[in-house]
A protein has these predicted regions:
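Generic alpha-helical hydrophobic packing signal
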Residues: 26-33, 39-41, 63-67, 93, ...
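Short small/polar-residue motifs
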Residues: 47-60, 119-124
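Gram-positive cell-envelope targeting signals
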Residues: 2, 13-15, 19
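Short, exposed beta-strand/loop patches in secreted or surface proteins that constitute
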Residues: 54-61, 68, 129-130
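Low-complexity/repetitive intrinsically disordered segments
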Residues: 1-7
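Extracellular ligand-binding interfaces
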Residues: 68-147, 155-164, 169-171
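Extracellular carbohydrate-recognition regions
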Residues: 18-52
């Protein structure tokens, strides 16, 4: 089969990025430690929300959100611990989010400072799994005996999928 384009015809365009599902109301976020230092709210910056394979990250500092869009086979993005955070032993991570599509599936894994390139506590991607489209918040247990290095959010062969992160709260 030979495909040809007529002279003067425009080139095909890429698949448009998805538009957001109905979202929750904006939330008020204060970065850093709470008063009794039992919870740390991760600042959403280009350093703390890192793109991996097959992802794009857009941080909106005014809205205090990060939009991650996924495209490709097993794309991933990372939540990185800031360098000025000396104690990164946490019992759980709470992620407040809005999904961009209903049909795509996402999973997660933790990475600790004792082996920075190894994924542990993996939750495999399913449509209604860790980041269900009808939920807007998830609390995920962490190994509180280890220093958290990164938290990985990955897709399962996503095609123009993603979500908006509104807050990341790490609990002692």
């Amino acid at each position: 089969v030979v495909l040809k384009r007529e002279a003067g015809a425009t080139a095909p365009t890429a698949t448009p990025k998805p538009t957001a599902l109905p979202t929750t109301a904006p939330i008020e976020v204060t970065y850093g430690w709470n008063a009794d230092e039992t919870e740390y709210t991760l600042p959403l910056t280009e350093e703390t929300v890192g793109k991996g394979n097959g992802t794009e990250v857009s941080v909106d500092t005014n809205a205090k959100t990060a939009t991650i869009t996924y495209d490709g086979a097993y794309p991933d993005a990372f939540l990185n611990m800031p360098g000025d955070l000396s104690d990164t032993k946490f019992s759980s991570i709470i992620i407040k989010y809005d999904r961009l599509t209903e049909k795509d599936s996402f999973g997660y894994a933790s990475r600790y400072t004792d082996n920075k390139s190894t994924d542990v506590n993996i939750k495999w991607a399913t449509v209604s799994g860790a980041f269900a489209p009808d939920a807007h918040e998830v609390e995920i247990p962490l190994d509180k005996t280890k220093d958290l290095y990164q938290f990985k959010i990955f897709g399962n062969a996503c095609d123009s999928a993603g979500f908006i992160i509104k807050a990341v709260i790490l609990k002692k």
